[in-house]
Amino acid sequence: MKMKNTDIKNNWTTKELKDIYDLPFNDLLWKAQSVHRKYHNPNEIQISTLMSIKTGGCPEDCKYCSQSIRYDTDINLEKTLPLSDIIKQAKNARDNGASRFCMGAAWRNLTQSNLAKVKEMVKEVKALGLETCVTLGMLTDTQADELKNVGLDYYNHNLDTSEEY
């Protein structure tokens, strides 16, 4: 039931993308659900845990985000958490059924000194038998490769394109 890399289409034409975009919403949901059911048991869910490893002080101006330093929120600027705190939370997540542990930081982009810390976090969390995920802002290609090489499974990056933000 697991998806093979050969099943992933990555050569979409503009017309094909437009055809998907123009689908009525319920038809789009049906097609998405059909693909999901083809490759996954529809009655199973994956439990993931997200932990903020560095809270507050992000220089970006996303109006909806409490992490932004540009708005008056109740979020205090905190330093990056020590590795021991992160591993303790990852173990707790695993022991409570999570199979993926995502670490998020309020950064615009990743500095080299923070990259070294995050690489160690990824290695240690991976050693616990968890899938690893991070959301750290913008990365260079080299940084992405370095994270991949230490075992990172997933990278989340929010793309905020609304004129409202």
PLM feature spans:
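Conserved Radical SAM active-site core
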Residues: 69-165
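Flexible, acidic/Gly-rich N-terminal and inter-domain linker regions that tether
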Residues: 1-64
